[in-house]
Amino acid sequence: MLSRKIVLAVAATFAAMTAMAQCGKITGKIIDNGTREAVIHATVQLLGGDSAFVAGTVTDVNGEFAIEAGGNGKFIVKVSSIGYSVITKTVSVTGGMDVALGTLTMMPDAVMLEGVTATGQAKKVVLKEDTFVYNANAFRTPEGSVVEELVKRLPGAEISDDGKITINGKEVKRIKVDGKEFMTGDTETALKNLPTSIINNIKSYDEKSDMAKMTGIDDGNEETVLDFGIKPGMNKGTMANTDLAVGNHSRYAERLMGGFFNDKVRTMVFGNFNNTNDRGFPGGGGGWRPGNARNGLNTKKMVGVNFNYEEKDRLEIDGHARWNHTNNDTRAEQSAEYFNGGRSSFANSLNQSYSRRDRWVLRMRMEWTPDSMTTLLFRPELSTTTIDKRATGLSASYNSDPFLLYQSPLAPHAIEQMAEEGSIVSTSASNSIFYDNQKYAGATLLASRKLNGEGRNITIEAEASYNKGANEGMSLADTHLYGIINTEGNDSTYQTNRYSTTPTKSYRYSVQATYSEPVFRKTYLQVGYKFAYGHDKSDRSTFDFSKTGGDTFSGLAPAYRGWGQYLARLGNPIGTYLDNDLSRSSDYRSYIHEMQMTFRMVRGKYQMSAGVMLQPQRTRYRQVFKGISVDTVRTVTNFSPTFDLRYNFSKVSRLRISYRGTAAQPAMADLLDITDDSDPMNIRRGNPGLKPAFTHSMRLFYNNYIPRHQRAVMTFAHYSNTRNAVAQTVAYDEKSGARTSRPENVNGNWNANAGVMFNTAIDSTGYFNVNTFTMLGHNNHVGYVAKGRDAASVKNTTRTTNVTERLGLSFRNSWIEVELDGSLNYTHARNLLQEQNNLDTWQFGYGASTTVHMPWGMSVSTDLHEQSRRGYNDRAMNTNELIWNAQISQGFLKNKALTVMLQFHDILHRQSSFTRTLNSMMRSDMRYNSINSYAMLHVTYRLNAFGGGGGRGQFHGNGGRGGHGFGRPGGFGGRRRF
């Protein structure tokens, strides 16, 4: 009897699931009422009878769409696109039958199109809800340039020396092309290889994690995305772009790019080889960016392929494979001041390093939708990385500022003189060799099932990863202590000669389940549970040759993986030099349970969510170091509340306020009461009394767009405060120059920043445009300092205020663009313990740029900017640098497919490479070697065979003659997921 009931229950469940899977599909096509052309990437939403969101999609290149109803009943189809009036259509789905709406026409919105219709001038930026849409045609870039040059010109965008992209105060973590994944995890490849000539627009928005998109639960893992939209007509067919360049000072740059596109498949292949530090094109505007240093001489090589496949509403496959190689030659001069209680200590160093890096990466994403209620997502990844490095260095520490006496404090005569005066503490000469090899494999599997059309769903996610590494290193140092006398009455000297090997292993896995239940109308309760396990193992063996004699390794120069030449000079087998006190093995395991609950409301004007996460955590740490074996277990519970409110004033105006509290536990190694003096000049101690830290973080974001005046406004603010933050107490030994650090909990660490972006046309015709980006930041950094290893610690607070401003005024018509621009970065730092260390530094620049297009296909771009620094300790760094760049290009053949360009970088030989860092413990100024002044001759050839006419004759740099807005209305590129 019981078995019969079970069979009936299973049959009923199967029947219900089958019925749910029989969902009607609604199809249609959207066209422009005037041109009768397809409206591409229009937003199509399916709403229930109560206007609740059911499903969404965007139209394809033919203006067509298909959307699953998810059940029977009456629905509203809502179609919207920037530049058009919204259209709605009521439909009924019965018996799971498909519904064909046929062709729907969209009428242009007279208000939104007023600026473009009247003048034909391109709007620079349009805002729609949470998305910034930048018109690529409104930002002229030099012929043959890549999208990095385009991003530099976007209002509110910055690209740092290390390639980090920041836009509107947020770091860009992902690049997409037409809404599809592109080289995930590698923003540099897109910036350095995608040509601007194929880009129609750039979207900037925050994208939730895969888990959050499927469940609706905000897990705090949003990523800021730059989404490059391809020009209409260029998304079907084949294209190729070749750029070959040579220059003086042995500079070269070769870039190859090919693409194949059709309705289902998109394949792009890239190759890039250069020794110009991947430096962009000169001229064409954009102004100066503070801190635009060139850190060393870099040779970079890259080969990659990106693949996208889409079977509409059924299957998506995204993947990429790439090889990156980097050779680096860096000469770094550092000048540092350390805040030690009542007075400062100073240090200077000169280091020459060479490194090479090879990295292979394979990443894929597969999303399968067997029916409208079920989604499966799989993300595998494989990578291998090898790094080689060799370096030599010279450093010295002082008890007074050496620049007050000598322009070159590391010069032999300066060191000798300061030794007689007693102002120098120590010197050290070193060389080192390092090798590291890492292999990684990981995968994520995510499955989501809608249980009805009202918002009830369940999602399961599983992750696993494995990493195996091995590194070897050889380091030699010869240290001279001027304040310590040996038994013979001379200055104390000692050598530190060591070789180490460190194999490592780590693996992790986690399982997570979330469930969403509609509790009221458009109101949902979501709960989730996650278990995560992690295991990290390291076993460092250190061999000490410090007592073998000062001449054992004389005459040897560091070479990649060249420790064999050093080990060959040892008089005994290497095993006899093993130092158990310097060797260390560790085993770290973590067991984390995570429970979360989120309450979410969705209304016509706003969305609100509030939640809480509890995280019981058990960790076990085992270590053998200095002959001491430690086995410790820690059990803690972390707590994290969240709140998020999004209010839509209109389609182009939104306010967002969010809060998140996060708890963080001290590192287990910091909790061990062990002194690590393996580096005698930098000694570390543990602190078993450390408490967990808790950070409050609040954000505000507002944007608005006024189409009539082509005016965009954006403002943001962020505040963060950490209780029981971990800071390092640093004790300075005036005799030896050694520093002993110990972690301590501090309160008072907080930071805040706010920014405003404003972009508007000045005249009614849109020829004149002004844009400004202003940012104000303040950081309150607390630390402890002490003079002497056993001296009492003194609390030190450094308060730093930064003001950044970028202002540009431009004029543009069909053949010329002129821009006047200025930039300012002011730092106001106050040290409460030592007022003499208060700093006020300025970096500012101003100048002009212009681009002219001649009727016969010639283009000339140039810019002239004065860059200045003030307030730096080293007087040699308070400079004025007049930077002049220029480029001239001429197009040949049909549609200017062949272009010859001559570029001149830093014609006046005035640019330098300099950076500064500042916190409560120290300030540090760095200067690097670089080749900033050179000329390059480029030959570029473009071949394209596109299926649509839109791509032909338009394969030129952005903003070429006749650039018009965003193409036809509605052509805003990338696909957005719902």
What is the predicted function of each stretch?
Residues V39-I40, A66-K74:
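Short Pro-Gly-centered beta-turn/loop motif in secreted/extracellular proteins
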Residues I30, T131-L154, T166-I167, V177-F182, ...:
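Short, polar/charged loop or turn motifs at beta-strand boundaries
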Residues L127, K164-A212, V225-P232, V265:
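Periplasmic plug
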